[in-house]
Curated annotation (Swiss-Prot):
This is Retinol dehydrogenase 12. Shows clear specificity for the pro-S hydrogen on C4 of NADPH and the pro-R hydrogen on C15 of retinols. It catalyses: all-trans-retinol + NADP(+) = all-trans-retinal + NADPH + H(+); 11-cis-retinol + NADP(+) = 11-cis-retinal + NADPH + H(+); 9-cis-retinol + NADP(+) = 9-cis-retinal + NADPH + H(+); a 4-hydroxynonen-1-ol + NADP(+) = a 4-hydroxynonenal + NADPH + H(+). The keyword Lipid metabolism applies. SUPFAM superfamilies: NAD(P)-binding Rossmann-fold domains. Substrate binds at residue 175. NADP(+) binds at residues 46-52. GO terms for biological process: cellular detoxification of aldehyde; retinol metabolic process; visual perception. One of its GO terms (molecular function) is all-trans-retinol dehydrogenase (NADP+) activity.
Length: 316
């Protein structure tokens, strides 16, 4: 027993000593474009922390007018102040947006449209993960309501401004977790059977299907859409699960930093000549394979229609 303990301790010690090299190996792709975007207007949800914050920082550095759309305005202002100081770009603004409340989403969109005549990049970055069963203000299961329906409604409300500003892009953060996802139309709200991990996977699959269908419907408008897997990133998204927080801390030396996790979002927002790949899924700044469920045209169309029904909107 003592021998096994010593062996395990030695193995973990070696693992942690080599962590910097391992982390560098798994760091993934880097957004290499030098494109500058002065005068461009960007909205990023959940940009008060994590990947979204680093995405906002880089886009501000490149000259964009960046809107941090987040639930916690105080954290948003703190992030914005840091980004403004770091980039010397004063055009980093914070607006209240709670994706678990359709009234908040509509209020954000109404204010933004009154303030801005252009919108060139919309990055649907915010998300929740591994939440105990709960519902949004409007009665939707939290993962499905925030990660999918909230961004679906926001995109719908801002779409005309994107079209008017074309060429424009929509970037939806998905995840490799879509591989465990399944759109269970008979139980979208998870009332019959619920597992937080699968609920997250279902919502990430919904993000991919939404991106696919959105790209199809936007053909010829000058607006393109992309889905992104940022990688396994050390961020606050695990805050709803004690077990995940513990595991994330334990294995944090091997995960991507938030800056590394932002690279694929930046690639899809900035890289030139991506238009032919609208609707596709990217990881480490290159196109990646998706599950057969994520390629199902009928499921994508049905999810679109059901989402419209649940939100009470007409989106042809």
């Amino acid at each position: 027993m003592l021998f096994i303990l010593v062996l395990l301790t030695s193995f973990l010690s070696i693992l942690y000593l080599t962590a910097p090299s391992i982390r560098k190996f798994f760091a993934g792709g880097v957004c290499t474009t030098n494109v500058q975007i002065p005068g461009k207007v960007v909205v990023i949800t959940g940009a008060n922390t994590g990947i979204g914050k680093e995405t906002a920082r880089e886009l501000a550095r490149r000259g964009a007018r960046v809107y941090i759309a987040c639930r916690d305005v105080l954290k948003g202002e703190s992030a914005a102040s840091e980004i403004r100081a770091d980039t010397k770009n004063s055009q980093v603004l914070v607006r209240k947006l709670d994706l678990s409340d359709t009234k908040s989403i509509r209020a954000f969109a109404e204010r933004f449209l009154a303030e801005e005549k252009k919108l060139h990049i919309l990055i649907n970055n915010a998300g929740v993960m591994m939440c105990p069963y709960s519902k949004t203000t409007d009665g939707f299961e939290t993962h499905f309501g925030v990660n999918h329906l909230g961004h679906f409604l926001l995109t719908y409300l801002l779409l005309e401004r994107l079209k008017e500003s074309a060429p424009a892009r929509v970037v939806n953060l998905s995840s490799i977790a879509h591989l465990i996802g399944k759109i269970r139309f008979h139980d979208l709200q998870g009332q019959k059977r619920y597992c937080s991990a699968f609920a997250y996977g279902h919502s990430k699959l919904a993000n991919l299907l939404f991106t696919r269908e959105l790209a199809k419907r936007l053909q010829g408008t000058g607006v393109t859409a992309y889905a992104v897997h940022p990688g396994v990133v050390l961020s606050e998204i695990t805050r709803n699960s004690y077990l995940l927080c513990l595991l994330w801390r334990l294995f944090s030396p091997f995960f991507k930093s938030t800056s590394q996790g932002a690279q694929t979002s930046l690639h899809c927002a900035l890289a030139e000549d991506l238009e032919p790949l609208s609707g596709k899924y990217f990881s480490d700044c290159k196109r990646m394979w998706v599950s057969s469920r994520a390629r199902n045209k009928k499921t994508a169309e049905r999810l679109w229609n059901v989402s419209c029904e649940l939100l009470g909107i007409q989106w042809e």
